[in-house]
């Protein structure tokens, strides 16, 4: 497989995950991220919705507040050590409140991006770089 084919495949898989994330968002799911730059990156990729920052209060209280809303929850913390710990703790708290959070999108993004990026805030730049290398443009590029 050539580098171009590898980049195309990665971009295709990331676009599929972004589409899935957009579907969750459209159903009213709460997308949990670590910081404001994560939100900005996702919005630049065309993801709109209800974003919540998990880093400004006790995780237990945060999880309880979100669980009370009764919405689906997507955990999209960074895929570094701190983000891994945060995802595990949040997932445990949500499960104790009867919610099964979506973690697959995060896990797949981690695998696809390999060691090239480790955080959500870099996702927009990474996708833009892949689009440039493959000559691919999506309608989101022109919004």
Curated annotation (Swiss-Prot):
Organism ancestry: Archaea, Methanobacteriati, Methanobacteriota, Stenosarchaea group, Methanomicrobia
One MF annotation (Gene Ontology) recorded for this entry: metal ion binding
Record keyword Ligase present: no
Assigned keywords, A-Z: Magnesium, Metal-binding
Cofactor requirement: Mg(2+)
Protein name, entry field: UPF0292 protein Mbar_A0484
Entry binding sites for Mg(2+) 1: 34, 78
Family: Belongs to the UPF0292 family.
Pfam families tied to this protein: Toprim (PF01751)
Domain Toprim: 28-109
Annotated signal peptide: none
Cofactor note: Binds two Mg(2+) per subunit.
InterPro entries: TOPRIM_dom (IPR006171), TOPRIM_RNase_M5-like (IPR034141), UPF0292 (IPR022972)
Binding site for Mg(2+) 2: 78, 80
């Amino acid at each position: 497989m050539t580098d171009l084919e590898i980049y195309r495949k990665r971009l295709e898989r990331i676009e599929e995950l972004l589409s899935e994330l957009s579907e969750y968002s459209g159903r009213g799911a709460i997308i949990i991220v670590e910081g404001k730059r994560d939100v900005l990156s996702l919005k630049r990729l065309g993801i709109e919705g209800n974003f919540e920052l998990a880093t400004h209060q006790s995780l237990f209280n945060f999880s309880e507040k979100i669980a009370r809303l009764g919405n689906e929850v997507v955990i999209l913390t960074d895929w570094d050590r701190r983000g891994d710990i945060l995802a595990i703790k949040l997932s445990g708290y949500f499960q104790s409140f009867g919610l099964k959070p979506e973690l697959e999108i995060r896990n797949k993004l981690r695998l696809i991006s390999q060691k090239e990026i480790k955080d959500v805030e870099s996702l927009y730049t990474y996708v833009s770089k892949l689009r440039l290398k493959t000559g691919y443009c999506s309608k989101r590029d022109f919004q």
